[in-house]
């Protein structure tokens, strides 16, 4: 499922590819834990803060309640009870 997002919202368990096209700052809530689920993303302009659940900024990182995305493409994967962030350069 592909989704363009321009306002604050919640992601769904069927969101697989997300492009953030907002111009201002938005807050996006992750779906409930679904082990193995991966959400690919691309941030185009405005600020994006991911919230909800237990978030790790990288494998082995310290748990956070939110993470601010940079402009790189990446993905966030549900691994057990955590959403783990990976960037693709």
Per-segment meaning from a language model:
Residues 1-54, 79-89:
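Exposed extracellular interaction/assembly regions and N-terminal maturation sites
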Residues 70-80:
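Extracellular disulfide-bonded cysteine-rich modules/repeats
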């Amino acid at each position: 499922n592909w989704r363009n997002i321009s306002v604050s919202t919640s992601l769904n368990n069927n969101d697989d590819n997300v492009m953030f096209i907002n111009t201002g700052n938005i807050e996006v809530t992750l779906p409930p834990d679904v082990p193995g689920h991966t959400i690919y993303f691309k941030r185009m302009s405005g600020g994006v803060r991911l919230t909800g659940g237990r978030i790790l900024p990288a494998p082995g990182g310290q748990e956070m309640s939110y993470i601010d995305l940079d402009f790189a493409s990446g993905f966030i994967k549900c691994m057990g009870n955590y959403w783990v962030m990976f960037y693709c350069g």
